[in-house]
Amino acid sequence: MKDKVGRVLLDKRIKIVLPYLEGSLLDIGCGTNKLVRSYSGKGIGTDVYQWGDVDVIVKDAAKLPFDDKTFDTITMVATLNHIPNRTQVLLEAKRVLKDSGKLIVTMIPPKISRVWHGIRKPWDADQSERGMKEGEVWGFSKPELKELLFKSGFQTIEEGSFNLGMNQFFVLKKINKI
């Protein structure tokens, strides 16, 4: 990540997420892997792109090379909107998350995302180089995201916003069928 504003925002996201991390961590869509490197526990960062210090590169985040119920915490920080097969990836996250584990998701609302990325594009080499791919969306509204997460087998246990309401976060648990 080459732009200073992007680094500041990433640092803010990490600051919001870190207190919720427990046990073994999997960061899906880890980018530069800064969250895992900032965590004091054991963690693995995975991404479909080699942004830098990624632990595991995968072709498809819906096919993770981990056993069932491996991780205590899974994070998707500013990631889910960039994943075209997001429902399958959420189901895969559910598979590798322990029954007592937590999923933590941060997301920018789509209207704010369009404005922000439009302003930022001239000085963000990563965004200009990579661009938006088919199936990616600018973000999710809170109701859209909560519905997607619920349909994928997750229940919200805590939610909030940060960056003056321009980003939202969700802490979720698995809905385990009886």
Predicted segments, located by residue:
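Short catalytic micro-motifs in class I SAM-dependent methyltransferases
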Residues: A78-H82
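A SAM-dependent methyltransferase catalytic signature shared across enzymes that methylate proteins
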Residues: K142-E159, N176
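Short conserved loop adjoining the S-adenosyl-L-methionine
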Residues: K63-D68
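Conserved N-terminal segment of class I S-adenosyl-L-methionine
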Residues: M1-A62, G160-F169
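A conserved beta-strand element that flanks and buttresses the S-adenosyl-L-methionine
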Residues: T75
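Acceptor-substrate binding/catalytic loop of class I
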Residues: Q127-P143
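A short glycine-rich, Lys/Arg-flanked "PGG" loop and its adjoining helix->strand segment in the class I
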Residues: T87-D99
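Conserved class I S-adenosyl-L-methionine
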Residues: I104-D126
